[in-house]
Amino acid sequence: MQAAYERIEADMRGIWGDMAPAMLRKRLRDVHADLSTLSREDLQRIVELLRQKTLPSILGEDGAEVKAKQYLAWVDDSG
C-alpha cells in the first residue's frame, strides 16, 4: 500500500504542490491510520475523504470523482 500512497502523494503534489503531504497526513489522522501499517481499507477510506472533502475544491465534483477512481485503481493495482 505504501507504493499506492506515494503515487497518490506525487499526483497530489502536481495539484497542490508542497501542501500535498500535509493534506494526506490529515486524512491519515481522520481514518486513524498510520503510514507504517497502512491497509488497503485505510487507503480506500482516505481516497473517499479526498473525493468528498479535498479534491472538489480544485477539480470540482466531476473532476474529484474521476481523480478518486484513478486513485482507487492505483490502490487495487498495488496488491
Show where each model-derived region lies.
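Alpha-helix boundary/interfacial micro-motifs
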Residues: 34-35, 79
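N-terminal acidic leader/helix
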Residues: 1-30
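Short, charged, intrinsically disordered terminal tails
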Residues: 69-79
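Short, charged early-sequence alpha-helical segments and their helix-coil boundaries
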Residues: 35-71
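Acidic, low-complexity cytosolic segments
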Residues: 16, 24, 59-60, 72
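Long, compositionally biased, intrinsically disordered segments
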Residues: 28, 61-64, 77-79
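Residue-level marker of intrinsically disordered, low-complexity segments enriched
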Residues: 6, 13, 44-45, 73
